[in-house]
C-alpha cells in the first residue's frame, strides 16, 4: 500500500463481497486515510444473508468512509445460491443504497435481463453507480447509460474474442 502514491494512485475504493470482507474494508478505511470502501454482499455470497446479518450490513454501510453499496447484483454462472435468493438480496441492497443515498457497484454475469429488470423495478436511475466488469452488448450498454450508470470495462476488452465489448467501448461516452 505504501507504494500506491509513488505510482500516482491517491485514492482507493476497496469493495466488500461478503460480510467478512466488508468488515475488513471498514478496518482498512479506518487505518489508511486514502482508502474508502463499499459495503455489500456479492450475489455468490447472498446465501449467508438473513435479516440479522442484513441489519448488521445496514450499520456497517453507515461507517464513516463507506462511499457505495457493492458489490451487489446477480450471478447465474453458478447454480448456488439459487436465483430467487440472489434476487431478494439484490432488491434489498438496492433499497439500502437508496435509503443511505449511496451509489451502487453492480455485478451481473449470465443474468442480463433479470439484472436490468430489477434495476428498472427499483428505479435505480435514482441511485446511480457503475456496472463493473461490464460484458454485455451495445443494446444492454445503452440501457444502463440511459439510466445514468457508468460502465466498468476491464482487461477483457483486449481479448481477441471481445468484439461486442469493443463495440460497446466505441459507442460509450468517455465520461
Model-predicted segments: where are they?
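Mid-domain alpha/beta scaffold segments of enzyme catalytic cores
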Residues: 1-175
